[in-house]
């Protein structure tokens, strides 16, 4: 992955705790410093992990791996009234052994998930473990495994290295619960390049064939197939300056005004250029072989530090009908620069948390360009266990609220006439010295984790920014706070920031603040969830 500073990509991609630095956060004292240690200590503490909720850093309402390690989400597919969500899983993480399989979880509402175990196992052939790819439901039996068979095209690296990536096929005839391999030969051999991975396959109904988008360093290659077994190169889209492109995404979506756009997305590392390290995307057109972008520079679906390997997938109603005006998205809340620092390693025996599933729509901006807006999936509202309605709160300086919590959502609309900045102090310590800051300042919105324990021990990636027009005099914020993550949605999801943060479990206060003036925090509501 980009940004690994020379560390073996395979070791990172496969997720091994050995040699990783895990942050152990004290739960009963505010003065003890975070501890770090090597793989042996991590393994021992994982086996003796706490079973009490008070000592747990497992997310309250976000998807987490049951044990060991997860990284890249794989695009969910809809089968028999539920989404089948696969993700990369390493059962040998705490033993220091690399290599991922595809584990499966199922869900009907994208909030509550049921673990189904490993669906596509690793190391069952000479080709070793499985990397990222995509699953499709072959309703037309184009591959010959039967109508409705689930076909996975996945990257593997025969020989155990990282420099010979090829695409292989697995298939399922039981609805995607278990898979077998289609031999040991690749369905798309490597043409002699280093980066050749993460196949994303879609059905091109207009042309009656399958299309694959493949990550090839600074290019996304496009391939055609009639049967998912034989692939032909068709063209490519090239963009440099944001690291090695990974986990491509390709879909069509209709805006509220009826405009239809194709979207090409990639996971990318823009840190070196002062850009995010998340999901970059372009709107444009696709003729089945070539993608033409509306603008050369990408937009970003998330501007925080920790929303990587994200996938989007179809939004369906209860009857399975596809909504052409929206999609869902989910991302891995971590970053390869500090993938082994979460306190869940020590406290809970796992490393792997996802973002909330988001509903993504195509909206038109005031300059007549188009962008993707995001909101938490609506079904989250069905799990509300407590609501605290604070109404309108006037603030001039800092106001500590009469509320304590670790895992919650807070929404508010900040309004002012003259102001420099305003926002919220999340997971504030009893003495006010530690907190996560979220809000606006001058001409940008921000999420800042500097004043609490967090994954970035280098101190470099602490505050994320997105543009903001202060003359608006108002801003809507919707913020999801959980035990190790914060997601901030600005102005109905025009911009989103997702970052890891590991506050002490006794840091439960919430405060509102203003800088250079007063403001009214309108319709301020806190919701807690039971999932």
Residue ranges and their predicted role:
Residues 312:
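Early-domain small/polar-rich strand-loop-helix modules and first-structured segments
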Residues 8-13:
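N-terminal export leaders
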Residues 23-44:
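C-terminal region of N-terminal signal peptides and the immediate post-cleavage residues
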Residues 37-199, 203-246, 254-303, 321-324, ...:
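Beta-rich carbohydrate-recognition and catalytic domains
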Residues 288-291, 301-308, 316-531:
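Beta-rich accessory regions
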Residues 1-7, 18-25:
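N-terminal secretory signal peptides
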